[in-house]
């Protein structure tokens, strides 16, 4: 069901209104406490600027890290407030706590177009418990609710789900709307052929998404460490490559399911091997039927890259989740980089390319190709759950579109 969005609320709906906006500001910091990547902050700017332009009083709620329901000075949102202020070119007032007298006083002092950032909502254990009283206190600061934190939409927490019971309208922000449009659109009404590229080290973390994608896709390409579980299930030797012994039957079932449905399931034909798990390891290319003892696969091979590129050439929609190899080591990044380059080229030819969160996003950014993709998802777990066809509590709680 489509959700009501911020785009449908105009100045007369929002001017002078206190708007609680759930954002995803869970950014990485270095040891000195400085932000190393502000992508998530920048991703929320369209929603924040729209609300400022419509004369709203913008109250931002966010979590940061895992403080386990206690105040942790290392997880305060102070550096985020500073960076956001720079990006908006206007002051951002941060509260000492997300609820209570200080938050109330700072919200009451707001003029239209002002921005207040509430302190880390996870300093209260009630946030993750979706406690109704806590949600009511948060909601009490505002008149309207906007959820723009897609990365937290798969959690039923007080600031993502609970507050919607007390605030109407409750709508999707621009980032949330874009995520739903691309990810749901790719699954529900894709332009075909539809291909999914699924990588990463473990089958276990991608079982749900693999099963769902085999149901929906024309082609499924598998890379990353999980391929060795499939090879071992076929009876092939895999050296000392990563294998999930308890998932061998599942790998067989997934291959059989794809075959029964007429879905092209592609595994690499060759792999790049290493003699140990290190950036400077000795390496060699081997056919997957001839992996020697004592070696481990850390990337897909050159022949596999060509086969994958050929399979993707005619696709109109491609979803990518998970790297092809250990791309953090330059020596074993060729497969991942080749997929990133191929998708960038396909985008230029009108293919809808969706990078589904997590390490694939880091890989695309490392390759300098982020701008070339149709959509880069900001959600890791949320992206996977949406692609699996699961209902995201933070989305379900929003008002339905009229």
From Swiss-Prot:
Cellular location(s): Cytoplasm
Binding-site list for ATP: 206, 297, 328, 357-360
Record InterPro entries: Phosphoglycerate_kinase, Phosphoglycerate_kinase_CS, Phosphoglycerate_kinase_N, Phosphoglycerate_kinase_sf
The enzyme's E.C. designation: 2.7.2.3
Gene Ontology cellular component terms for the protein in this record: cytosol
Catalytic activity line of the entry: (2R)-3-phosphoglycerate + ATP = (2R)-3-phospho-glyceroyl phosphate + ADP
Pfam families named among the record's database cross-references: PGK
GO molecular function, one term: ADP binding
Keyword Kinase belongs to the record: yes
Binding, substrate: 24-26, 40, 63-66, 122, 155
Record's keyword terms, sorted: ATP-binding, Cytoplasm, Glycolysis, Kinase, Nucleotide-binding, Transferase
Keyword Repeat: no
GO-annotated biological processes: gluconeogenesis; glycolytic process
Cross-referenced CDD domains: Phosphoglycerate_kinase (cd00318)
The protein's annotated pathway: Carbohydrate degradation; glycolysis; pyruvate from D-glyceraldehyde 3-phosphate: step 2/5
Assembly and binders: Monomer.
Family statement drawn from the similarity comment of this UniProt entry: Belongs to the phosphoglycerate kinase family.
Protein name: Phosphoglycerate kinase
The species this protein was found in: Synechococcus sp. (strain CC9311)
């Amino acid at each position: 069901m489509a959700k009501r969005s911020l785009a449908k609320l105009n100045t007369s709906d929002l001017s002078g209104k206190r708007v609680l906006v759930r954002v995803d500001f869970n950014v990485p910091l270095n040891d000195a406490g400085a932000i190393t990547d502000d992508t998530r902050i920048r991703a929320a700017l369209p929603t924040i600027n729209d609300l400022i332009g419509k004369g709203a009083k913008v109250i931002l709620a966010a979590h940061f890290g895992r403080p386990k329901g206690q105040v942790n000075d290392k997880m305060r949102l102070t550096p985020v407030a500073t960076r956001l202020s720079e990006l908006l070119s206007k002051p951002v007032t941060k509260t000492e706590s997300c609820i209570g007298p200080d938050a109330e006083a700072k919200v009451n002092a707001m003029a239209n177009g002002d921005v207040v950032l509430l302190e880390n909502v996870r300093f209260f254990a009630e946030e993750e418990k979706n406690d109704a009283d806590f949600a009511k206190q948060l909601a009490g600061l505002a008149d309207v609710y906007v959820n723009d934190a897609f990365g937290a939409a798969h959690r039923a927490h007080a600031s993502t789900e609970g507050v919607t019971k007390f605030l109407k309208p409750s709508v999707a922000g621009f980032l949330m709307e874009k995520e739903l449009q691309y990810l749901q659109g790719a699954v529900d009404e894709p332009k075909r052929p539809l291909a999914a590229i699924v990588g990463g080290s473990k089958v276990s973390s991608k079982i749900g998404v693999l099963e769902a994608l085999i149901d929906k896709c024309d082609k499924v390409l598998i890379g990353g460490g999980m391929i060795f579980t499939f090879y071992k299930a076929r009876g092939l030797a895999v050296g000392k490559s990563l294998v999930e012994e308890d998932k061998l039957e599942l790998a067989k079932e997934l291959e059989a399911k794809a075959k029964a449905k007429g879905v092209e399931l592609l595994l690499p034909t060759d792999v790049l091997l290493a003699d140990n798990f290190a950036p400077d390891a000795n390496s060699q290319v081997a056919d997957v039927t001839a992996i020697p003892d004592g070696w481990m696969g850390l990337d897909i091979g050159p022949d596999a890259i060509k086969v994958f590129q050929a399979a993707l050439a005619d696709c109109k929609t491609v979803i990518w989740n998970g790297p092809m190899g250990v791309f953090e080591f330059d020596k074993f990044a060729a497969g991942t980089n080749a997929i990133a380059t191929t998708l960038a080229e396909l985008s230029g030819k009108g293919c809808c390319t969706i990078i589904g969160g997590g390490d694939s996003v880091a890989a695309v950014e490392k390759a300098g190709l982020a701008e070339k993709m149709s959509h880069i998802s900001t959600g890791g777990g949320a992206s996977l759950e949406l692609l699996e066809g699961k209902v995201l509590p933070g989305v379900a709680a929003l008002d339905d579109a009229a």
